[in-house]
């Protein structure tokens, strides 16, 4: 999927879903950036989190598997090329639903984190929503419920410190165009998302789950 993501890079950098909204502010706040704090931004995509954290003085390394995203380090979340405890904080935003091996990715993020993780991703809502996501973007693996996230993080040796929810509104046409989803697939996606729209399909909503967790010994 690397080449596909590189071709989408400009669209994701400009995407209002990723570039703004209060959930970005909240993720940055939960990372508690300050001068000298080392933070790894995993699956950094368009670089929105990285830029905001650097503006607050943090020393940020961006990591992404797609060359077109222009990250500092080219690598997937499942294979992070840093030593144990290299970063004070590891963050990933609206990306884990793309991770092929979620357990390995969490294990790697925990390994390189000295203290804390901040994770934002789409909350599991229904099988219809999952089908729509996969039709629109075949790189979508799956979304997870809050209980699943809690289980995965606790099993990885973390203590959940904070949990927040954010309801995000998507412009349907822009959302489909970002992945070149057209024709029959687009029509089917619109049908599947109809229960999540309050305006006849012009927009639809999902819920983002934002968690902050800390290593038990930190």
Task: Name each model-derived stretch.
Residues 94-95:
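Short catalytic micro-motifs in class I SAM-dependent methyltransferases
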Residues 1-34, 48-52, 167, 173-177:
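Conserved class I S-adenosyl-L-methionine
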Residues 40-79:
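Class I SAM-dependent methyltransferase SAM/SAH-binding core
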Residues 122-140:
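Short, glycine-/aromatic-enriched active-site segment of Class I SAM-dependent methyltransferases
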Residues 91:
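A conserved beta-strand element that flanks and buttresses the S-adenosyl-L-methionine
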Residues 46-48, 162-218:
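Conserved Class I S-adenosyl-L-methionine
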Residues 142-157:
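Short alpha-helix
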Residues 103-117:
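A short glycine-rich, Lys/Arg-flanked "PGG" loop and its adjoining helix->strand segment in the class I
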């Amino acid at each position: 999927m690397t080449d596909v993501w590189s071709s989408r890079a400009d669209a994701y950098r400009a995407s209002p879903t990723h570039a703004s909204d209060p959930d970005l502010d909240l993720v940055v706040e939960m990372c508690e950036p300050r001068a000298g704090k080392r933070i790894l931004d995993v699956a950094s995509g368009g670089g929105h989190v990285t830029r905001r954290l650097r503006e607050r003085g943090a020393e940020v390394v961006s990591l992404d598997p797609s060359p077109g995203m222009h990250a500092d380090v080219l690598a997937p979340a499942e294979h992070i090329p840093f030593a144990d405890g290299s970063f004070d904080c590891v963050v990933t935003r609206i990306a884990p639903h793309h991770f092929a091996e979620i357990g390995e990715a969490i294990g790697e993020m925990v390994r390189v984190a000295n203290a804390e993780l901040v994770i934002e991703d789409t909350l599991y809502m229904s099988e219809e929503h999952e089908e729509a996501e996969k039709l629109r973007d075949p790189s979508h693996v799956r979304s997870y419920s809050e209980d699943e996230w809690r289980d995965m993080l606790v099993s990885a040796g973390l203590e959940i410190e904070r949990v927040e929810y954010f309801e995000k509104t998507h412009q349907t046409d822009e959302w489909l165009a970002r992945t070149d989803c057209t024709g029959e697939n687009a029509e089917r996606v619109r049908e599947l998302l109809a229960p999540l729209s309050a305006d006849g399909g012009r927009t639809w909503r999902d819920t983002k789950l934002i968690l902050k967790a800390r290593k038990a010994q930190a």
